[in-house]
Amino acid sequence: MAKKSNLTINFEYYLLRFFCGFVNLIPYRVAMGIAALFAWSAVRVFKLRNKRTMARLRSVFPEKSEKELKRIAFRSFANILQSGVEMIRAPRLTRKWMDRHVVDGQYYKDRLQSYVDEGKGVVIMVPHSGNWYMAAWSMAKYGLPLFAIAAKQRNPKINDWMKRQYGDIEVVERGSARTLVEIKKKLEEGRAFAILPDLRVKEPDVEVDFLGGKANVSRGGAMFAVKCGSPIVVAVMRRENGKHVFDHLGTLRPDPDAEDKKAEAARLTKEAMALIDEKIRLYPEHWFWYNKRWILEPVHK
């Protein structure tokens, strides 16, 4: 992939900082309202990715009316833009802010801390629902020793900006030679590992029943849990009355006597995705229906 020129790097970075400066100047609720208005215009007026998104929704919810599907599409896109606003404002989201905007945040931190205190780390699987970053931001702000993986941005200045936005979350760079070693080491040290499980992977891995179809997802997160003996917490974020709700769907534990570790990781992955599937069907407007990598796209073997 071609390296960006200094002119392009600086233009992209300062354009981003200008936009961020504007978002940070206005009150939080006003910014969230503007984001929702932009989403309404994009979905209802300009029909942004409308055909593709509506086709996905119809395939998953054939029983729902067009009006209801359009509402889900709008709320899903509004959630994306509002999450972007919160990403920009992330360094300003203090613990007091979390107390006001994250329902029972301290309670869930203590619950996760109890797993960390077992000494084998914990794998936290949170899908693309609500502001999934908020799950990590809030838990880290309450003091949970948490880390995640992230891809390196092509623009080095934007990459550094992203690292600052992660705040109290330790970030392991995806794709480096030591990524897998670092993840295993941190779990063995008793850290919490946040991971997105609802991503389609290109190479055949674990086929799961999901949203009425078959999805090919990675067993990577579960494999770390199996190797380290870590519990897996499956949770979903969603928005409710202007606040963030952390729904704990279940805690899965690997079988320490399992001889086939790959099969055990596959079992855990399927169980986690089944829990997530059930929740998405209850609250579809909170899930990311606009993802370019459609999770139900068949894998070419």
Region locations from a protein language model:
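Short, flexible loop segments at the rims of nucleotide/cofactor-binding pockets, characterized by
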Residues: 97-103, 169-174, 210-212, 258
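Non-catalytic C-terminal accessory region of glycerolipid acyltransferases
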Residues: 3-7, 74, 114-117, 141-144, ...
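Membrane-anchoring hydrophobic helices of lipid-metabolizing enzymes
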Residues: 2-126
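Soluble or luminal CAZymes and related metallo-dependent hydrolases
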Residues: 14, 49, 104, 175, ...
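Hydrophobic alpha-helical segments typical of transmembrane helices
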Residues: 18, 30, 53-56, 158-162, ...
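A conditional alpha-helix N-cap/helix-loop micro-motif detector
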Residues: 102-105, 129, 155, 173-177, ...
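Catalytic core of membrane glycerolipid acyltransferases/transacylases, capturing the structured
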Residues: 118-176, 200-206
